[in-house]
Amino acid sequence: MDKLLDRFLNYVSFDTQSKSGVRQVPSTDGQLKLARALQQELLELGFEQVVLSKQGCLMATLPANVAWPVPAIGFISHMDTSPDFSGKNVNPQILENYRGGDIALGVGDEVLSPVMFPVLHQLLGHTLITTDGKTLLGADDKAGIAEIMTALVRLKKSQLPHGDIRVAFTPDEEIGKGAQFFDVKAFNAQWAYTVDGGGVGELEYENFNAASVQVKIVGNNVHPGSAKGVMVNALTLASRYHQQVPESQSPEQTDGYQGFYHLHSMKGSVERADLHYIVRDFDRNGFEQRKQTMLDIAEKVGAGLHPDCYIEVTITDTYYNMREQVEQHPHIIALAQQAMRDCDIEPNMKPIRGGTDGAHLSFQGLPCPNLFTGGYNYHGKHEFVTLEGMEKAVSVIMRIAELTALRAKP
């Protein structure tokens, strides 16, 4: 199990799909099964302070191998996969020396095409690990777990100087609960990095401000033959509500630093309709304005309704942009940039169009930017990762550990 690829293939065999709307953490038993397997692996490899909490958060330490004081740093990845697509019976395909063109995913009609995913043009000659078209792959974030584990093992075997290295594998990141029961004090690191990014070179310390918006619409159902002046169709109101949401500010029409409104799900009948939106914005003022827009639309569409019929909007903030926290510690970013350059990788600073455990942890006093994994197209059947990208992530983790020790040397 010393090989990076073997580790990754083992981890993706665990079904760890998280589940929204569940109060317990972790939300699924499969995550605990992987946590226990990782706990056993860490113990067998001789790591110290291996602790698994009842909420499924696993922590461990690789002790320092130098005599001088070095800041303790951490590396964190999450064990769950997205609820958006099946993570059961993952059957990875390994394609060595990719030569271009479409890649068949399994035996059906599904393909991974450079027409839809142009990044493939940059990966000629690489070893690609894909799905069989029936599930997601789980590189998000089991590639990160495999990379951290492999980096620790190699550091332990090598003579490279390093201080205390703390690692954590968390549950339920995909549903925003990954850091809810994370014990920052017990983790005892001065700063950390999540290994949960995308393509090689990605280094991220800005993420969305995020909120969940539940829109409850209550109508009045009567026989349609005698409905005039009496029926209030909740589905019609739902349609009117959504038509007021700025269409040009949807996920499929935005990128970079642009925020969005996203209708995630809807269900309903004449009597009642429920819409679930997520709103995202990098700027805090823009974020607050988006939430106000959702309230304003409800007031506009619901104007003049009978008191028994109404539109109710419930907004819950999910996480905030960690930039304001991480920018107070510029050496953390500079260190990661230097480590990448030392590994012949050009850092690609970009905003996270999503969230990570690092966002929550940064606000809990553990500054925590995000490193790449070498994976692409997360949360669906077109997800893939390159073995070369994973190896580079391992090298960067090791170099960050080494640089931290060298910079602290008297």
UniProtKB/Swiss-Prot annotation:
InterPro entries: ArgE/DapE_CS, Bact_exopeptidase_dim_dom, Peptidase_M20, Peptidase_M20_dimer, Peptidase_M20B. Its EC number is 3.4.11.4. One of its GO terms (biological process) is peptide catabolic process. The active site is at D80, E173. Zn(2+) 2 binds at D140, E174, H379. Binds 2 Zn(2+) ions per subunit. Pfam families: M20_dimer (PF07687), Peptidase_M20 (PF01546). GO terms for cellular component: cytosol. It catalyses: Release of the N-terminal residue from a tripeptide. It comes from the Bacteria. PANTHER family: PEPTIDASE T. Cleaves the N-terminal amino acid of tripeptides. This is Peptidase T. The lineage of its organism: Bacteria, Pseudomonadati, Pseudomonadota, Gammaproteobacteria, Enterobacterales.
